[in-house]
Amino acid sequence: MPKETRSFAVLGLGGFGSTVALELARFGNRVIGADLDERKVSRMVPHLHSAIILDATDEAAMREAGIDRYDVALVAIGRDIKASILATMNLRLLGVGTIWSKASDRTHHRILSKLGADRVILPEQEMGRHSAQMLHNPAVQDYVSLGNGFSVVNIIVPEKLDGEAVSALAIGSENDIRLLG
């Protein structure tokens, strides 16, 4: 069954925001990108449904731009913590259904959570944990933390186990490991 197309507003088109916006558009979603920097906006015009110059700290400007009509909004404003906080608050006031906000540190994370962001992400810390896991064990090809102590790990099968039936291996009984296809 094909996935329903959703609409996303990405506020802040720096490295992180533009990457998210481009990927969401590549997946077939309707994406508006917004930033104060005209150069960042103009680079996104050919790739997104819409790209606009917008001050996300201005609630009226966000309403006029129709940001309230998007299913999900991502506040990807990087260095300006005040602007990030105001943008998150404005999205909540506008009634945007789902709000993700990028934080620069733990305190910023707490503030965005208290303002009602549905998900607050710390990209550098999350990528740092991901990289450490993969560097720690060279057999790990990819790693996704699911939270609450659960992870999905793609590993290289050791040569000595190649060709063995999974049922013949004593995997999981003492380490709480589950094999996925």
Regions found by a protein language model. Name each.
Residues R129-H130, V140-E159:
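Internal, active-site/partner-interface "lid" segment
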Residues K3, S7, L11, A34, ...:
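Cytosolic Rossmann-like ligand/nucleotide-binding regulatory domains
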Residues G17-S18:
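N-terminal Rossmann-fold NAD(P) dinucleotide-binding loop
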Residues A34-L36, A103:
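Conserved acidic E/D residue at the C-terminus of a beta-strand in Rossmann-like folds
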Residues L24:
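Aromatic pocket-lining residues of Rossmann-like dinucleotide-binding sites
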